[in-house]
Amino acid sequence: MARPTIYRVAGQRLLVEAEDAWATRAVAALFADWYLDAEGEPAAGDPSAAAMIVRSAAPVPAVPAGLPSFDVAGGGTCHTDGGTSYIEIDGSLVVIGRSGMADAEVWMNGPLALDSAVLTRLVTYALSAALRRRRLFELHSAALAHPATGAGVLIVGPSGSGKSTQAVHLASAGWPFLTDDVLLLREAAGRVEAWPLRRSFAITAGTFAASRFLQARTRFDAADAGDDDKRLFAPHGVFTAGFKDHCVPGTLVFSGLSGGGSSRVSRVSPGEAMTRLIRMSPWSCYDRATAAGHLAILSALARQAAAYSLEAGRDLLDPEASANLMAACAAEAWT
């Protein structure tokens, strides 16, 4: 029996249906790790059309033959006709934007382990597509707020670019935090806002070793680390500066690792910032139904926030040096 549930995310409500008992458990388990708060079954005034449907007991439909295709993260393949997209991973399927269906529908190739990376990837693709159709656009970025002004600082980059390390150091230094990895962009009152998506921080043994603050308050057990050698921890009871549920970004820092001892920072033009944001947001080009809105919010963000390129060296393993550098970027952005 289908179970519809209203979830609140980034100030909006989303109707999600799980069509069997396993799907109900899977959605609840995954959404508990993200800032998606269950509000129960739909009531008067709530969305009546499902944004997303998940099922494990129904046969996986066939993908139409002859569609252009490309590889996507997680070992999957996306087939698309420009309007509808079909994402295949290990025999399971996500269908996005098909007429007469929910915005995103997931067919699992049987029940998967709840900690399966494939399950997480499939539901993430579906959720991201449903959110894009509600003008909530995902960006891989850490986000914190300057402790004096409250202005948002986004540290943008792919996995392994130093986002989590810098987020840990800044939060340890008293910066209120939003997320260390994934956020949602939305437009409100003529400004771009950033809202966190993932609840946990994910750190490597190296980040833990560089943070006396964390060492005094938590532990790193290699046995708890995932396939990417990162361990999740809940930041809310660790960092005293506290959590912010959203911010207005004033500074963008595009982060990468230099491999050297010293870090280098340079100012980036709005045009270059836009290019980098698009590079970090492939669905702004792949998903034609939402591309215009997606590109518009990235453009607005590039104009709203002062942008910097950071080639992070080993000196930023020092928490004080990291906090000082980010504070300097934020201070320059205000002038």
Region locations from a protein language model:
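Post-Walker A alpha-helix
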Residues: 166-167
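Active-site flanking residues adjacent to catalytic metal/cofactor-binding acidic residues
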Residues: 180
